[in-house]
Amino acid sequence: RSCNIPDGKCRKLIKDSFENYWKNIYQNKNTNNYEFQSLQSKETIDWHKKYIQNCISNQFKKYKPRVLDIGCCSGNLTNLFCQFSSEVVGVDYEEGFIKNANSKYSVPKFFIGDIYNLDKIDGSFDLVVCFGVLQNINDLVLALKNIKLKLSTRNHSKVVFTTINQNSIFNRNDLSLKLTRSREAKNLTLHTFTKDQFYQSSKLSGLKLTRYEYLYILPRFLGPLRFFIKKIMPTSFSHHIFVEMQHA
């Protein structure tokens, strides 16, 4: 429990806090500076782009998957799935993001919704992605149960998350927070989960944890040293984690 009030009120309090936070970001951003909310944002977005284009596209060679992107924001990453998918749906609870996405992209379908409420989204999906969202929720089991209901039972179907590493040193002091968070986010307490919490929550949700990996997303000038940094630096130097689940 993250607060000492009833579950319903606690969840609403947290949801309202993050809703106000995202609205503040949306109302004060413009298209040109969105990717540069922190020094690491550009590299983080670039990593996700490469993962979608180079990795996910190769995992679905036998059929074109139906894709659900939860927390799609303005659809910049969502649109990339259209290159190899039969249908792509993006969901975000911030209306401004959905309006922006619909104005920019014609092929993906975009809807207002959130990770706790996917009932209005029709059908099941071979791939569910949730990039940078879990640090904004407190009920991991409930989120996973909702996702499971949307995950198809076809071969290779999976759900993929990226989120913040709980053990990251970049969560521990003011200088590190300036490097890894936007100005609006640096004073917020984000929710992080251990590997064991992911494992236990997946079991309770009817899913199984199939991959858990520390990501070393580095500033571009350190890119050539990535291999050595992964070998010699502890996992606390990884600010992000990659999590994959499938039906149990």
PLM features: residue spans?
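Short catalytic micro-motifs in class I SAM-dependent methyltransferases
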Residues: G132-N136
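A short glycine-rich, Lys/Arg-flanked "PGG" loop and its adjoining helix->strand segment in the class I
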Residues: V141-H156
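Acceptor-substrate binding/catalytic loop of class I
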Residues: T180-Q197
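Class I SAM-dependent methyltransferase SAM/SAH-binding core
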Residues: S74-N117
